[in-house]
Protein backbone atom coordinates (compact mmCIF):
# COMPACT_ATOMS: atom_id res chain seq x y z
CA UNK A 1 0.00 0.00 0.00
CA UNK A 2 1.41 3.39 -0.99
CA UNK A 3 0.46 5.25 2.20
CA UNK A 4 3.20 7.23 3.91
CA UNK A 5 1.68 6.64 7.37
CA UNK A 6 1.42 2.87 6.89
CA UNK A 7 5.06 2.87 5.79
CA UNK A 8 6.09 5.01 8.79
CA UNK A 9 4.38 2.77 11.36
CA UNK A 10 6.98 0.02 11.16
CA UNK A 11 9.85 2.51 11.01
CA UNK A 12 8.57 4.39 14.08
CA UNK A 13 7.48 1.24 15.92
CA UNK A 14 3.78 2.06 16.07
CA UNK A 15 1.17 -0.68 15.81
CA UNK A 16 -1.19 1.33 13.61
CA UNK A 17 -1.36 4.40 11.42
CA UNK A 18 -3.93 5.83 13.84
CA UNK A 19 -1.06 6.62 16.23
CA UNK A 20 -0.18 9.57 13.99
CA UNK A 21 -3.71 10.95 14.35
CA UNK A 22 -3.27 11.10 18.12
CA UNK A 23 0.23 12.59 17.76
CA UNK A 24 -1.29 15.36 15.61
CA UNK A 25 -4.05 16.00 18.15
CA UNK A 26 -1.55 16.11 21.00
CA UNK A 27 0.66 18.55 19.08
CA UNK A 28 -2.31 20.86 18.50
CA UNK A 29 -4.23 20.52 21.79
CA UNK A 30 -1.52 19.44 24.31
CA UNK A 31 -3.59 16.49 25.49
CA UNK A 32 -0.99 14.71 27.61
CA UNK A 33 1.16 15.40 30.64
CA UNK A 34 3.42 13.00 32.46
CA UNK A 35 1.70 11.03 35.21
CA UNK A 36 -1.84 11.45 33.89
CA UNK A 37 -4.33 8.62 34.19
CA UNK A 38 -5.77 7.76 30.78
CA UNK A 39 -8.44 5.40 29.47
CA UNK A 40 -8.14 4.31 25.82
CA UNK A 41 -11.48 2.94 24.56
CA UNK A 42 -11.35 0.80 21.43
CA UNK A 43 -7.62 0.48 22.00
CA UNK A 44 -6.67 -2.54 19.87
CA UNK A 45 -4.18 -2.87 18.20
CA UNK A 46 -2.66 -0.30 20.57
CA UNK A 47 -1.36 2.67 18.57
CA UNK A 48 -3.06 5.27 20.76
CA UNK A 49 -2.02 3.49 23.96
CA UNK A 50 1.58 3.54 22.71
CA UNK A 51 1.47 7.30 22.08
CA UNK A 52 -0.10 8.09 25.47
CA UNK A 53 2.29 5.82 27.40
CA UNK A 54 5.30 7.33 25.59
CA UNK A 55 4.15 10.71 26.95
CA UNK A 56 4.52 9.31 30.47
CA UNK A 57 0.84 8.62 31.11
CA UNK A 58 -0.60 5.69 33.04
CA UNK A 59 -2.81 4.02 30.46
CA UNK A 60 -5.67 1.56 30.85
CA UNK A 61 -6.63 0.20 27.42
CA UNK A 62 -10.08 -1.32 26.85
CA UNK A 63 -11.27 -3.19 23.78
CA UNK A 64 -13.68 -5.95 22.86
CA UNK A 65 -10.88 -7.35 20.65
CA UNK A 66 -7.63 -8.81 22.03
CA UNK A 67 -4.48 -6.68 22.13
CA UNK A 68 -0.84 -7.67 22.51
CA UNK A 69 0.81 -6.34 25.65
CA UNK A 70 2.45 -2.91 25.74
CA UNK A 71 4.94 -2.09 28.50
CA UNK A 72 3.31 0.16 31.08
CA UNK A 73 -0.23 -0.28 29.70
CA UNK A 74 -2.91 -2.26 31.51
CA UNK A 75 -5.21 -4.00 29.02
CA UNK A 76 -8.74 -5.17 29.80
CA UNK A 77 -10.60 -7.11 27.12
CA UNK A 78 -14.24 -6.16 27.54
CA UNK A 79 -17.35 -4.72 25.96
CA UNK A 80 -17.87 -1.26 27.51
CA UNK A 81 -21.59 -1.38 26.77
CA UNK A 82 -22.53 -4.89 27.92
CA UNK A 83 -19.94 -5.09 30.70
CA UNK A 84 -20.29 -1.53 31.99
CA UNK A 85 -21.37 -2.57 35.48
CA UNK A 86 -18.27 -4.77 35.82
CA UNK A 87 -16.08 -1.82 34.79
CA UNK A 88 -17.89 0.51 37.17
CA UNK A 89 -17.16 -1.93 40.01
CA UNK A 90 -13.52 -2.30 38.93
CA UNK A 91 -12.84 1.44 38.74
CA UNK A 92 -15.17 2.33 41.66
CA UNK A 93 -14.53 6.00 42.44
CA UNK A 94 -11.43 6.38 40.24
CA UNK A 95 -11.25 9.38 37.94
CA UNK A 96 -9.15 9.71 34.80
CA UNK A 97 -7.56 12.83 33.30
CA UNK A 98 -8.11 11.86 29.68
CA UNK A 99 -10.57 9.48 28.02
CA UNK A 100 -9.81 8.59 24.41
CA UNK A 101 -12.18 6.78 22.08
CA UNK A 102 -11.07 5.60 18.67
CA UNK A 103 -13.92 3.06 18.64
CA UNK A 104 -15.54 2.35 15.31
CA UNK A 105 -18.01 -0.27 14.16
CA UNK A 106 -17.17 -2.77 11.46
CA UNK A 107 -18.07 -0.88 8.29
CA UNK A 108 -21.03 -2.19 6.34
CA UNK A 109 -20.29 0.16 3.43
CA UNK A 110 -23.51 2.12 3.83
CA UNK A 111 -22.46 5.56 5.12
CA UNK A 112 -25.77 6.41 6.78
CA UNK A 113 -25.85 3.12 8.72
CA UNK A 114 -22.14 3.35 9.61
CA UNK A 115 -22.83 6.86 10.94
CA UNK A 116 -25.69 5.65 13.16
CA UNK A 117 -23.55 2.79 14.47
CA UNK A 118 -20.57 4.99 15.32
CA UNK A 119 -22.82 7.54 17.02
CA UNK A 120 -24.08 4.76 19.31
CA UNK A 121 -20.44 4.05 20.22
CA UNK A 122 -19.86 7.79 20.76
CA UNK A 123 -22.79 7.89 23.19
CA UNK A 124 -21.38 4.85 25.03
CA UNK A 125 -17.96 6.53 25.24
CA UNK A 126 -19.55 9.74 26.52
CA UNK A 127 -21.49 7.84 29.16
CA UNK A 128 -18.22 6.24 30.23
CA UNK A 129 -16.64 9.71 30.43
CA UNK A 130 -19.53 11.04 32.53
CA UNK A 131 -18.73 8.37 35.12
CA UNK A 132 -14.94 8.36 35.07
CA UNK A 133 -13.57 11.66 33.71
CA UNK A 134 -12.10 14.02 36.28
CA UNK A 135 -13.23 17.64 36.55
CA UNK A 136 -11.23 19.64 33.99
CA UNK A 137 -10.46 16.45 32.03
CA UNK A 138 -10.21 15.82 28.30
CA UNK A 139 -12.39 13.61 26.09
CA UNK A 140 -11.43 12.72 22.50
CA UNK A 141 -13.89 10.75 20.39
CA UNK A 142 -13.95 9.57 16.78
CA UNK A 143 -17.06 10.38 14.74
CA UNK A 144 -18.13 9.90 11.15
CA UNK A 145 -19.66 13.06 9.72
CA UNK A 146 -23.36 12.67 9.21
CA UNK A 147 -26.83 13.59 10.29
CA UNK A 148 -26.33 13.60 14.07
CA UNK A 149 -22.71 14.61 14.72
CA UNK A 150 -23.70 18.27 15.27
CA UNK A 151 -26.27 17.26 17.91
CA UNK A 152 -23.60 15.18 19.64
CA UNK A 153 -21.18 18.14 19.47
CA UNK A 154 -23.82 20.39 21.05
CA UNK A 155 -24.29 17.82 23.82
CA UNK A 156 -20.54 17.94 24.49
CA UNK A 157 -20.57 21.75 24.59
CA UNK A 158 -22.87 21.56 27.63
CA UNK A 159 -20.26 19.50 29.50
CA UNK A 160 -16.90 20.92 28.38
CA UNK A 161 -15.37 24.40 28.26
CA UNK A 162 -14.03 23.86 24.73
CA UNK A 163 -15.12 21.45 21.96
CA UNK A 164 -13.36 21.38 18.58
CA UNK A 165 -13.75 19.31 15.43
CA UNK A 166 -10.39 18.01 14.18
CA UNK A 167 -9.52 16.16 10.96
CA UNK A 168 -5.92 14.91 11.20
CA UNK A 169 -3.73 15.11 8.10
CA UNK A 170 -3.00 11.42 8.70
CA UNK A 171 -6.70 10.59 8.26
CA UNK A 172 -7.51 9.44 4.75
CA UNK A 173 -8.92 12.35 2.74
CA UNK A 174 -11.86 10.31 1.40
CA UNK A 175 -12.90 9.28 4.92
CA UNK A 176 -15.78 10.98 6.77
CA UNK A 177 -13.82 10.30 9.97
CA UNK A 178 -13.23 13.26 12.27
CA UNK A 179 -12.55 13.72 15.95
CA UNK A 180 -14.23 15.83 18.58
CA UNK A 181 -11.65 17.11 21.06
CA UNK A 182 -13.36 18.25 24.27
CA UNK A 183 -11.32 20.08 26.89
CA UNK A 184 -12.17 21.18 30.43
CA UNK A 185 -14.84 18.76 31.65
CA UNK A 186 -17.41 20.68 33.70
CA UNK A 187 -19.54 17.66 34.55
CA UNK A 188 -22.83 16.02 33.78
CA UNK A 189 -25.15 13.44 35.20
CA UNK A 190 -24.42 9.91 33.94
CA UNK A 191 -27.31 8.25 32.10
CA UNK A 192 -26.85 4.93 33.95
From Swiss-Prot:
The active site is at 142 (proton acceptor). GO terms for cellular component: cytoplasm. HAMAP family: RNA_methyltr_E. Belongs to the class I-like SAM-binding methyltransferase superfamily. RNA methyltransferase RlmE family. Pfam families: FtsJ (PF01728). Specifically methylates the uridine in position 2552 of 23S rRNA at the 2'-O position of the ribose in the fully assembled 50S ribosomal subunit. S-adenosyl-L-methionine binds at residues 46, 48, 63, 79, 102. Its EC number is 2.1.1.166. It is found in: Cytoplasm. The keyword Hydrolase does not apply. InterPro entries: RNA_methyltr_RlmE (IPR050082), RNA_MeTrfase_FtsJ_dom (IPR002877), rRNA-MeTfrase_E (IPR015507), SAM-dependent_MTases_sf (IPR029063). SUPFAM superfamilies: S-adenosyl-L-methionine-dependent methyltransferases (SSF53335). Its main location: cytoplasm. The keyword rRNA processing applies. It catalyses: uridine(2552) in 23S rRNA + S-adenosyl-L-methionine = 2'-O-methyluridine(2552) in 23S rRNA + S-adenosyl-L-homocysteine + H(+). It comes from Wolbachia pipientis wMel. It is an enzyme of class 2 (transferase). This is Ribosomal RNA large subunit methyltransferase E. Keywords: Cytoplasm, Methyltransferase, rRNA processing, S-adenosyl-L-methionine, Transferase. The gene is rlmE. One of its GO terms (molecular function) is rRNA (uridine-2'-O-)-methyltransferase activity.
